Swiss-Prot record:
Active-site annotation: 129 (proton donor/acceptor), 157 (schiff-base intermediate with substrate)
Protein name: 4-hydroxy-tetrahydrodipicolinate synthase
Subunit structure, interactors included: Homotetramer; dimer of dimers.
Residues at the site labelled Part of a proton relay during catalysis: 41, 103
Pathway(s) where this gene product acts: Amino-acid biosynthesis; L-lysine biosynthesis via DAP pathway; (S)-tetrahydrodipicolinate from L-aspartate: step 3/4
Signal sequence bounds: none
Annotated function: Catalyzes the condensation of (S)-aspartate-beta-semialdehyde [(S)-ASA] and pyruvate to 4-hydroxy-tetrahydrodipicolinate (HTPA).
């Protein structure tokens, strides 16, 4: 799985799940053979109840997609995370994305035991997620080293923004797949040893994302993708990507759940310009 899409969760204006838009989004990804990651930070999982999350996973699995489904496992409660993994075992998903514990800032021993416990329960391939900007701590190198040989440690998603740290992960073991978790850093992280991308921008540009992953050295595309990624990162994810998806009518509404708000998108007036810029992608074969 070289490319996975970190899927948004579409909501209706009353903040309930918009299942029609959700199916449209997943079919959009299926056409380009992308795996999907549900209920990560892009999917606003922390704002959803356990019942809502299960309904989303159940609905996605009922679509019989021809691409793998990976489900996010966030939180700080080991019991709740374990129960969520147990719930998901009832569905034909491919595996899990297990986030570094948020807010509690454990040391290396606590973090290692946390991941080991959840990997033992997973019984499916799992991707460990380094996201220090949200969790408050990095995914420690010693934790990765200790767990590298675990049979369910399939991959590592690195959204830490440090090329040096990415290199250290890549040099540690060939037993797991290293995924870039930042659209704009794909070329640099590929050079460091990343072999896959978990993308936010592929929600709206799945074909372009596939071409981007297959040819990270195309300078014109790299510059264009980096510019759009920079625009996206002006505000907290998934505010901007939802605005783009709604503008392009991939989803019906740009609704977010508090504490996220579409009013925090200060660059909304530039959405048509961003769409126009990405329309140049199809001419990129003339720019090498």
């Amino acid at each position: 799985m070289k490319l996975l899409t970190a899927s948004v969760t579409p909501f209706l204006p009353d903040h309930s799940i918009d299942f029609l838009s959700f199916e449209n989004l997943l079919r959009f990804q299926e056409r380009e053979s992308h795996g999907v990651v549900l209920l990560g930070s892009t999917g606003e999982s922390l704002s959803m109840t356990a019942k809502e999350k299960e309904s989303l996973v159940s609905y996605a699995c009922s679509l019989n997609l021809k691409v793998p489904i990976i489900v996010g496992v966030p939180g700080t409660s080991l019991h709740e995370a374990s129960e969520w993994i147990h719930t998901c075992q009832s569905y034909p998903i491919y595996g899990f994305l297990i986030t570094t514990p948020i807010y509690t800032k454990p040391g290396v021993h606590g973090q290692t035991l946390w991941f080991e416990s959840l990997l033992n329960k997973a019984n499916k391939p799992a991707i460990l997620y380094n996201i220090p900007s949200r969790s408050g701590t990095t995914l420690y190198l010693d934790t990765v080293r200790s767990l590298a040989a675990h049979p369910f440690f399939y991959g590592l998603k690195d959204s830490g923004g440090s090329i040096k740290h990415c290199q250290e992960y890549a040099q540690m073991s060939s037993d797991f797949v290293l995924y870039c978790g930042d659209d704009g850093l794909w070329p640099q992280m590929y050079e460091c040893g990343a072999r896959g991308l978990i993308s936010v921008l592929s929600n709206i540009w799945p074909k372009e994302a596939r071409e981007w992953v297959e040819d990270p050295h195309h300078q014109y595309r790299a510059d264009l993708w980096r510019e759009v990624s920079s625009w996206l990162n002006q505000t907290t994810n998934p505010i901007a990507i939802k605005a783009l998806l709604a503008y392009k009518q991939v989803i019906a509404h740009n609704t977010l759940r508090l504490p996220l708000s579409i009013q925090d998108l200060q660059c909304a007036e530039s959405i048509p310009e961003i769409i126009k810029k990405m329309a140049q992608w199809k001419y990129s074969c003339a720019h090498v």
